[in-house]
Curated annotation (Swiss-Prot):
It comes from Escherichia coli O157:H7. Disulfide bonds: none annotated. Belongs to the HupJ family. This is Hydrogenase-2 operon protein HybE. Pfam families: NiFe-hyd_HybE (PF11939). InterPro entries: NiFe-hyd_HybE (IPR023994), NiFe-hyd_HybE_sf (IPR038530). Transmembrane segments: none annotated.
Length: 162
């Protein structure tokens, strides 16, 4: 077995879609918590810092996923290993997974199980929105007063004498 995983030169969307559809068909179809009508849907992937980043919804979950990008070599990791990553959205904990015939990847559960009241269109829109959100820069209000570092350290509020 190789010690490194080669990246995808182009988006792995089609391979990821096919792999999750096979999992759904082969081993997940009889579980009671499955969304009864949600198909597998994979958002478009975006290259972020050399890695393919996107989201996938299945009848059993919605997850953010990361696959190795062009010219990347990932070390082979233990499936189920946890890795914290800093994305523009914030720090997220990912779990190493492996899709047969695709590669190892990183996955962060965003929703599981899915609400049975969610329509297919809502699920697909949510998947696309989540893919954009995890790579969106956080927005803050510059007019909100911030306590200085010294005030935080010594328990003083702005406006008090130092």
């Amino acid at each position: 077995m190789t010690e490194e995983i080669a990246g995808f030169q182009t988006s792995p969307k089609a391979q990821v879609q096919a792999a999750f559809e096979e999992i759904a068909r082969r081993s997940m179809h009889a579980l009671s918590f499955l969304h009864p009508s949600m198909p597998v849907y994979v958002s478009d992937f975006t290259l972020f810092e050399g890695q393919w980043t996107g989201c996938v919804i299945t009848p059993w979950m919605l997850s953010a996923v990361i696959f190795p990008g062009p010219d990347q070599l990932w070390p082979l990791r233990k499936v189920s290993e946890k890795i914290g990553l800093q994305l523009p959205y914030g720090t997220m904990t990912f779990t190493v997974g492996e899709l047969d015939g695709v590669s190892q990847y990183l996955s962060c559960s965003l929703m599981s199980p899915l609400s049975h009241s969610m329509s297919i269109e809502e699920g697909q829109r949510l998947t696309d929105d989540c893919a954009r959100m995890i790579l969106s820069l956080p927005v803050t209000n510059p007019d909100v007063p911030h306590a200085g570092r010294r005030a935080l350290l010594f328990g003083r509020r702005s406006g008090e004498n130092a």
